[in-house]
Amino acid sequence: MRYFYLLFILVLCGCSPLDVNSAQEEVSRFHDFYQSGKYIELYNGASKTLQESISESDFVNVLKRAEVTDLGKFQKTTLKSQKKVKHLIGSDEVVLIYASVYSKRIVQEIFVFEKIKGNMKLKGYKYDSIN
């Protein structure tokens, strides 16, 4: 009987859909806010996991420094890869990898979103130069 309950729980965990489209919309929002310098709004809309890992002022400074020294202005982006990660324990995640063109360079951007109460929240972000 225990195995039946375990199987039932695993099946229920697998039924919860992860909305990749919502995560992609959040990437568009990220780029719009980046372009407008709305770094505090980005931070406030991020997951508690991200907010607990970096202060608001450090987050803002990282993005300002990225714009000034590495990236410049955002121009366009293309989705290269997407992955849904369903956890038995913890929040489900969507990982999106983009090739993005900025005025100073082309980068690979990796966005990690976690599903919190039905909404996709930014959990992690990084970029690496590809030119």
Regions of interest found by a model, annotated:
Residues M1-I9:
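Sec-dependent signal peptide recognition
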Residues V11-G14:
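C-terminal motif of bacterial Sec signal peptides marking the signal peptidase cleavage site
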Residues S16-D19:
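Bacterial signal peptide processing site
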Residues A23-G45, T69-D70:
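Post-signal peptide N-terminal segment of mature Sec-exported envelope proteins
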Residues S28-R29, S47-Q51, I97:
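Second-shell loop/turn segments in exported
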Residues I40-D92:
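Short solvent-exposed beta->alpha transition segments
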Residues K80-N131:
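Exposed beta-sheet edge and beta->alpha loop/turn motif
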